């Protein structure tokens, strides 16, 4: 049964409110809606845009009690264009970088995926913002990736049953070490104190 009919694409649908609603991504932001079924079939009402993240959101995962969420967005990489240094060179097509792995397969890495935590309230419009979110990799090199490029996604992170911890895998390397390694490690992130502990030793 088709539930939505909008000009934009919807994805990452998640049941909320005990099956009475859905959370999903539309136009790079998280939206929620009430959902019900009756004689006329399924109906969606009460659309609410919950997030307002300038860089957009590609994926998200709710905590077990649905009071928080993890979402994937992007931070600027170290790769620079001429316009980053000279405003009048906006049409110049070139890049500068001081590190390896500035490309993944078919694209230059202008943005790096990071995962963020925020409180989640289904009907609180624009409540998930950059100011209300915590970067799981805060305090670490900005070019660490979470999820890992180029093919990983939100499946690299998972909530503990009590919602107090997040397990994630990450390749915390830069430069030549990053370029020559595909080895990710597993970390446990404490949501309350924002500290991560590596638990794998491979």
List each language-model region with its residue ranges.
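Multi-bladed beta-propeller domains
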Residues: 1-10, 16, 33-56, 95, ...
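Short loop/turn segments that connect beta-strands within the blades of beta-propeller domains
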Residues: 18, 26-27, 65, 111, ...
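Predominantly five- to eight-bladed beta-propeller fold
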Residues: 71-142, 169-172, 176-187
């Amino acid at each position: 049964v088709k539930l939505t009919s909008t000009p934009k694409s919807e994805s990452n649908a998640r049941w909320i409110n005990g099956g009475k609603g859905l959370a999903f991504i539309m136009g790079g932001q998280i939206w929620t809606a009430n959902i019900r079924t009756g004689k006329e079939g399924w109906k969606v009402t009460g659309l609410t845009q919950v997030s307002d993240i300038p860089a957009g959101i590609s994926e998200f995962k709710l905590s077990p009690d649905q009071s928080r969420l993890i979402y994937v967005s992007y931070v600027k990489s170290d790769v620079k264009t001429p316009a980053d240094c000279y405003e009048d060179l906006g049409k110049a097509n070139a890049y500068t970088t001081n590190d390896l792995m500035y490309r993944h397969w078919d694209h230059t890495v202008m943005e790096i995926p990071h995962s963020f935590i925020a409180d989640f309230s289904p009907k609180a419009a624009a409540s998930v913002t950059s100011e209300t979110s915590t970067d799981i990799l805060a305090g670490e090199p900005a070019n660490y990736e979470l999820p890992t490029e180029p093919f990983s996604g939100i499946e690299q992170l998972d909530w503990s049953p009590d919602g107090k911890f997040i397990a994630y895998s990450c390749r915390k390397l830069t430069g030549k070490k990053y370029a020559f390694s595909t080895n990710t490690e597993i970390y446990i992130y404490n949501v309350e104190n924002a500290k991560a502990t590596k638990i794998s030793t491979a």
